[in-house]
Amino acid sequence: MRRRWAQMMTVAVLAVVCWTPPLHASLAGRIERILQSTAQRENRFGIHVVDAETTPRIPASNMKLIATAAALHYLGPDYTFKTEVALLDGALVVIGYGDPLLGDERIDPRHGRAPGWVFDDIVGALKDRGITTLSDVFVDGTFFDRQRVRPSWPPDQLNRWYCAEISGLNYNDNCIRVEVHNKGSAVVVNLDPPTRYVTVVNQVKPTSRGASAVEGLRTSEPNRVIVRGVCRKSEGFWLAIEDPTAFFGVLLYERLQAAGIRVEGKLAEKYLRHDKRLEVLRTYPTPIREVLERSNKNSLQVAAECLVKAISAENTVGRINGEWPHGLRLIGRYLEGLGVPAEEFHLDDGCGMSRLNRLSPATVTAVLLDRYRSEDWPVFRDSLAVGGVDGTLDGYFREEPYKGRIRGKTGYLDGVRSLSGYAETPGGMVVFSILTEYPRTSTYAAIRDIVKAIFDEAP
């Protein structure tokens, strides 16, 4: 198949734009003018544009494109994450199979599920059987290994939702909502869901002027958090918890107590999922399509990392201890199978939070082209944010003719801005990938203008 046009720039704006024949001078000129503007002259861009009918390159959250594409390659579009609830000799057992969306704030309302529905359903299943006493409660997250964060993730941000821990048993995006309310003479801090799992040290001061500013800081004691700052009326934020499997177990235990179901023994984490005596009461499924969507449309980090570990677990004897190193090696093999040279990528996580990730823009376009040509293209396409319509592109490309015609994934880290995806032009689908590194000025407008130029000038 014929390459219509392609461009690669990694320059400080002095760069000469190189094109493979035939020379697409109009687009080259427009992009060059954008990059030569006073605002962008000191910034570094990496850009790769190809016709979607032909061949082949990026980091930050654009890494999620690689993870989701590889997940479709290895797991398939019909793959389902699940969580099982079972009985075993009088004990209640909950087994996680890496579902990142159990209790997810966006997916649950879509299915008409109220907050905490899974615990209410488990209680209902027990009461339907007339069970009022349990010997023990066990939670099993061994579908994934015990490494819950990447060493390269910033230590001072591990309390943020976008650095949440990863487990075989996840709940509520592995976060808790902290709500702060000014009651006049004092400030009250509430947790949602309410639980004893997290201990709050309230250091928030009430104020009658200015804006509220509150934050949560971890301490050396797991899940003991200092909430500090000033609060004028009400303020809230998401806080990543430590040890998601234990978090789910405690929430379940507390709900059982509230419902009058007595636990005579202990609450513990235990490997039980291959025990043939398990009597399954409930299975809660989540299709991979929803996980891909939360990863790509909304940039949910937990979703992307669970895909990486699921790739590992499903390709391990015994389907156990899915891990980052193995999952990332398999993703690397997928890239090499597309003809991407090994020196053009280095993978350190699935979400792009790690600053050790290295991808050329041509690597990203190779992956995007592979998905475009695959049988599961509609699944991958629907996972992407749509310009002017939804996801992280909701506020961009709202005007015609771009609205609804740009699909892609944004990326942001300190010093990195990126956007990669597809432009559905009148002449056909075009694949693009844009990366800026360590810009000295804002590059948002320039990136959007480049995408518009790609759309306008496509053959």
What are these regions (language model features)?
Residues 1-10:
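Bacterial N-terminal signal peptides that target proteins for export
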Residues 9-18:
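Bacterial N-terminal signal peptides
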Residues 53-70, 74, 78:
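Short active-site loop at a secondary-structure junction
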Residues 57, 298, 308-459:
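Small-residue-rich helix-loop
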